[in-house]
Every structure is written in C-alpha cells, then in structure tokens.
Amino acid sequence: MPVKLGAKSDVAIDSKLSSLNPVALVLHNDDINSMDHVVQTLVSNIPEITVEEALEKMLKAHNFGTVILVKCPLERAELYQQRLITNNLITTIQT
C-alpha cells in the first residue's frame, strides 16, 4: 500500500529536492567596474573561484556579455549574489 505524505512532509521533500537542482549564478559585463575590481570581488566573495578562474570568467563576461560563475543550490547562489551586488557587480540567477 502506498504511503501518503502530509503537507509538511511534501514541503520538506520539495525543499530537499530544490537543493539538489543547482542554479547558475551569472555575471554580466558592465562599463563601470575595473577588471581588477571584478577579479578581486569574485575571489573575495565566492570561495570556489580561484584567481585564475576569476580572471578567466571576468574576460569571458567582458568579451561575451555574460558568464556562469558557479552552479550551486539556490540559497548559496542568493548569498553570493548579494555579496556581488554589494560590490556593484551585476548578476542574475538562472534556474
């Protein structure tokens, strides 16, 4: 016989499943910030990104308009996004 879960159980399961579906934190090119500022901000605020990766990602955003910085759970992406916005970088989150 199938087990029927209650509403609270469904919410808990949905929450756990959403953390398994990573989102993409995307950096957008801008004409305001210096390249050095972008690299330093990425390294200082996203632990997964090394200096070399930050430089590469900054150049991709500069040349192509956008670049995916990281793929991670939504909550972490929102935290990183707030940190980057505080430092005047333009970011979006894509599901």
Residue positions per predicted region:
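Terminal domain-initiation and capping elements
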Residues: 1-95
